């Protein structure tokens, strides 16, 4: 296992839809997948993240790992991996997100957070690390995480979903940090935690 660099907004791998993880006729997964998943967990844990998509570490495959509580206030923590996820959600509100309840951050936009409109409920179906079907469903923070990580795999960052003044603030943050160009990354444990955990 290894902690690997996390790509920063502007890297093409973050802005390109990922490819499905190949599944053999017998349901088998690639032999090197366990090592990738282990590296993703270690990197996510070192970064104090609640989720990490494969393309955030430069691997353009459709899977993410997570370690997320049900709500912002806590509740049961869920940890796992979803391979080739398919997302369903309730309706996404068209109003401006609440700055207190809808704050969202991303390891690929380190240290920044912005109110982001998300559906209140989400479900993801896919495969677990053993190639068995898995369904995850939740509300609140868990639903937000499912939408956020699946969005990564579709080639979008949460800042791409921002509207109004929040979108303008995110563009300013990207510019002022010198992001938005290929080749930038940060490695958890080698730099201070950008979110101050």
UniProtKB/Swiss-Prot annotation:
Q: Which cofactor does it need?
A: Fe(2+)
Q: Which reaction does it catalyse?
A: N-terminal N-formyl-L-methionyl-[peptide] + H2O = N-terminal L-methionyl-[peptide] + formate
**Residues binding Fe cation:** 106, 148, 152
Q: Which Gene Ontology BP annotations are present?
A: co-translational protein modification; translation
InterPro entries the UniProt entry points to = Peptide_deformylase, Peptide_deformylase_sf
Which domain of life does the UniProt lineage start with? Bacteria
Which top EC class is named for this enzyme in its record?
Answer: hydrolase
Residues the record marks as active site: 149
Write down the EC number: 3.5.1.88
Instruction: Could you list this entry's UniProt keywords, alphabetically sorted.
Output: Hydrolase, Iron, Metal-binding, Protein biosynthesis
> Any keyword Cell wall biogenesis/degradation?
no
Q: Which GO terms describe its molecular function?
A: metal ion binding; peptide deformylase activity
Tell me how the cofactor is bound: Binds 1 Fe(2+) ion.
Q: Tell me which stretches of the chain form a coiled coil.
A: none
Protein function: Removes the formyl group from the N-terminal Met of newly synthesized proteins. Requires at least a dipeptide for an efficient rate of reaction. N-terminal L-methionine is a prerequisite for activity but the enzyme has broad specificity at other positions.
The record's similarity note reads: Belongs to the polypeptide deformylase family.
- Protein name per UniProt: Peptide deformylase
- Tell me the gene name: def
């Amino acid at each position: 296992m290894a902690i690997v660099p996390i790509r920063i907004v502007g890297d093409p791998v973050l802005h390109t839809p990922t490819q499905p993880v190949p599944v053999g006729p017998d349901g088998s997964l690639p032999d090197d997948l366990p090592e990738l998943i282990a590296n993703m967990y270690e990197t996510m844990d070192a970064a104090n993240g609640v989720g990490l998509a494969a393309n955030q570490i430069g691997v353009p495959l459709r899977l993410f790992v997570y370690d997320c509580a049900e709500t912002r206030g806590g509740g049961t923590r869920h940890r796992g991996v979803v391979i080739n996820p398919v997302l369903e959600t309730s309706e996404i509100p068209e109003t401006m997100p609440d700055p207190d309840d809808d704050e969202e951050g991303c390891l690929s936009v380190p240290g920044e957070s912005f109110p982001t409109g998300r559906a209140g409920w989400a479900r993801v179906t896919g495969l677990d690390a053993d190639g068995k079907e898995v369904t995850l469903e939740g509300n609140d923070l868990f639903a937000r995480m499912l939408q956020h990580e699946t969005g990564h795999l579709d080639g979008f960052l949460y800042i791409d979903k921002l509207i109004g003044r929040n979108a303008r603030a995110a563009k300013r943050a990207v510019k002022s940090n010198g992001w938005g160009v290929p080749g930038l990354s940060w490695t958890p444990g080698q730099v201070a935690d950008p979110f101050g955990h």
